[in-house]
A protein has these predicted regions:
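Mid/C-terminal beta-alpha module of Rossmann-like enzyme folds, strongest
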Residues: 6, 13-15, 188-251
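NAD(P)H-binding glycine-rich loop region in Rossmannoid oxidoreductase-like domains
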Residues: 39-103, 115-117
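Short-chain dehydrogenase/reductase
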Residues: 86-90, 120-128, 135, 175-183, ...
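Conserved glycine-rich Rossmann-like NAD(P)H-binding loop of the short-chain dehydrogenase/reductase
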Residues: 30-36
């Protein structure tokens, strides 16, 4: 799909969605964003088309009987709890997929997550179930599974600035990731329409540079603040308890 395409975007008001819309526009695609009623559209690029409605009405209010070449979804559940995850990460996408097929869409680009490789939580299982549905649909697909976002690594900045220790599980070196920026990920998602190598593939992706651990993050943050590193080690067993609690929540 090297030529300009007409693209419907879901989840356009999130940080990754906004970056993806900008990247699609920069590549010359005609972008239509389907937003929830009342969703804040400020900051989206000029020249796009905004349409609003519930996901159940996407065929009528989103596609409107017109032909689209592609559907790009950055839509995700907010809480990740079982009911929310099933409704958004799976069911809403199933509705959107059916409407896309009826609208003649040739290609769906789906923002998923690297953590579905080892599903332990409801939202991971819901995402994985829809991935399987998309793969079996016969539609050309690109399923993008990014590692951590830079923004997700910034959650402890405020507490460290307030003089509190950086929290790590175990010794802070149990996990490592290659975080990716919103702009890089948005550009990668948009590029899936043009790059045949990314078609009909599940695409794990991380940012540039080496993988970093939570301890690496802490050391970098304290260095930037000109302070000695101060960690608080949380027992790994607490992680299991948190996962169990999240899995049970909403049932």
């Amino acid at each position: 799909m090297a030529e300009a395409a007409r693209v419907l975007v879901l989840g356009a008001t999130g940080t990754i969605g906004r970056a993806t819309v900008a990247a699609l526009c920069a590549r010359g695609h005609e972008v239509v964003c389907y937003l929830r009623p009342g969703a804040e559209a400020a900051g989206l690029p000029k020249g796009i088309t905004l349409r609003r409605g519930e996901i159940a009405d996407i065929a009528r209010a989103g596609f409107r009987g017109a032909r689209f070449e592609a559907l790009v979804s950055c839509m995700a559940s907010r809480s990740g709890l079982p009911a929310d995850a099933r409704a958004v990460d799976h069911d809403a996408h199933v509705v959107a997929l059916g409407a896309a097929q009826a609208a003649g869409v040739e290609h769906m680009v789906l923002l998923s997550a690297i953590c579905v490789q080892k599903p332990m939580l409801a939202f991971q299982a819901a995402k994985l179930a829809f991935e399987a549905r998309l793969i079996a649909s016969g539609l050309r697909y690109s399923i993008v599974r990014p590692t951590a976002y830079f923004k997700s690594l910034s959650g402890q900045i405020a507490r460290v600035e307030a003089g509190k220790p950086f929290l790590v599980f175990g010794d802070g070196q149990l996990t490592a990731c290659k975080p990716i920026s919103d702009r890089d990920l948005g550009d990668y998602l948009a590029g899936c329409l043009d790059d045949p190598w990314r078609w009909n593939r599940v695409l794990p992706i991380g940012g540039p540079g080496p993988a970093i651990t939570p301890r690496d993050q802490a050391e970098w943050l304290f260095q930037r603040l000109g302070r000695p590193v101060k960690l608080r080690q949380v027992p790994v067993g607490m992680m299991d308890a948190i996962i169990a609690g999240l899995s049970l929540g909403g049932r």
